[in-house]
Structure formats: C-alpha cells, structure tokens
Swiss-Prot record:
Protein name as catalogued: Biosynthetic peptidoglycan transglycosylase
A Pfam family recorded for this sequence: Transgly
Keyword Transmembrane: yes
A GO molecular function held by the record: pentosyltransferase activity
BP GO terms, sorted: cell wall organization; peptidoglycan biosynthetic process; regulation of cell shape
Gene that specifies this protein: mtgA
Pathway: Cell wall biogenesis; peptidoglycan biosynthesis
GO cellular component: peptidoglycan-based cell wall; plasma membrane
C-alpha cells in the first residue's frame, strides 16, 4: 500500500525536476542568445498579445522596433536610470538598501505596495516571465537576473531594457514610443522627451505620454533634475553605457 502511495509522489517529483531542468536550459539558452542577437519579442509582449486575442481585440498588435544603443539618444538611457535605478552601473542586479526600504514601507502600508526592482530585474521579468507578485515568480526573477548580470554587459542590459519596455498600450521599446508620441526616431529624443517617456514607466497603461497628467509632468520634472545631478551625458560615457 505504501509503495502505491509513494509511486505517484515520485513520479510528480521527477516530472517537476524535468520541467525545471527544461526551463533552466531554455532560459539559459535565451540569455546566451540574446547577449548578441536582437530580441524579437518578450514574454510581456506575448502575454499582452494573447490576452488581447482572447478578449476579442484582434486588431491589437504588440509593436516593437529593435534599435542598437548607437541609435538611441543618450538622454533616454540616462532618463530610465535616473527614474528607475540610479545605482545601475554599480550593483550586480539587486539594490539591497532599496529592497530593505521597500520591505519596511510595505509592512507599514499594505495597501500601497512599493517595489525596488532594478533595471536588470525588470529586464529579466519583461523578457522571460509573467506579471504578478508571487514568491515563485520573484524567485525565478532573481535567478534570471543573476544569469543576465553574469553574461551580459551593463550596456547590453540597458539596450535590451529600452527595446522591450512597455511605453503604452501595444507600444514596446523606445523606437516605437518615439515614433508614436514624437514622430521622430529614438536617436533624436531630447532630454525632456526622454524624461517624459521614463515618467510613465511605473504604469504605462494608466499614465499617458501623449496626454500627461499632473503627476506625470511632476515626475518628468523630477527625472530631469536627477539626470542633471547624475552628470548628464557624461554619466553614460563614464560608465560605458553609450
């Protein structure tokens, strides 16, 4: 009787291990491949596209145009660093002090959860994982972040991030965003335009770059101040990010 009970458990355990091994190979291969090859689509793009189709929105297209860092205004890279992760050149994927502050804040304010994800973590999540706040996803995100930080340069992480970040409904990547909102290539974005795009990143579906709210304008101004305090374009050159 005991053997019959153990057999299904053994089967499930082996199945789970095989699934995890397959995912590890898949994600490891993706990290290696995308260290040199442009990313054609991300997990978030696929999720949005499938959700739209299932909801009957057959006209929805998750649009993205890959561009190299040489074809992106240095203001854009600086803007997302100023807005999302000012210690990006220094850390190995995780900003521990920011995580500790976020945890302390969330304990006091359960209704207003604050995140502390770095650009590296956001890149790992957007590229390979699904939306959500489960501990399983967070654990996978941590492992993928370590893999990306080990294999990719900081410049590569920033390049991929800027090409797969969501800037609006169906708008992925800075080139698509620049063309949609400013009718120009990403290489010609000004400081203020880059800051405006970075200002909607916390929630690009709720916040609109083409119809900015008072909050978005306030955040844009704050990002511009932070960009100047970081040292402007020299920050990107100094940290070999452009």
């Amino acid at each position: 009787m005991s053997k019959r009970r153990i057999a299904p458990l053994t089967f499930l355990r082996r199945l789970l291990l095989r699934i995890l091994a397959a995912l590890a190979v898949f994600w490891g291969g993706g990290i290696a491949l995308f260290s040199v090859v442009p990313v054609p689509f991300s997990a978030v793009m696929a999720e949005r596209q499938i959700s739209a189709w299932l909801g009957g929105e057959f006209g929805y297209v998750a649009h993205s145009d890959w561009v190299s860092m040489a074809d992106i205004s240095p203001w854009m890279g600086l803007a997302v660093i100023a807005a999302e992760d000012q210690k990006f050149p220094e850390h190995w994927g995780f900003d521990v002090p920011a995580i500790e502050k976020a945890l302390a804040h969330n304990e006091r304010n359960e209704s207003r959860i604050r995140g502390a994800s770095t650009l590296s973590q956001q890149t790992a999540k957007n590229l390979f994982l699904w939306d959500g706040r489960s501990w399983v996803r967070k654990g996978l995100e941590a492992g993928l972040t370590l893999g990306i930080e080990t294999v990719w340069s900081k410049k590569r992480i920033l390049t991929v991030y800027l090409n797969i970040a969501e800037f609006g409904d169906g708008i992925f990547g800075v080139e698509a965003a620049a063309q949609r909102y400013f009718h120009k290539p990403a290489s010609r974005l000004s400081l203020s335009e880059a800051a405006l795009l970075a200002a909607v990143l916390p929630n690009p579906i709720r916040y609109k770059a083409n119809a900015p709210s008072g909050y978005v304008r306030s955040r844009q101004a704050w990002i511009m101040r932070q960009m100047r305090q970081l040292g402007g374009e020299s920050f990107m050159t100094r940290n070999q990010l452009n």
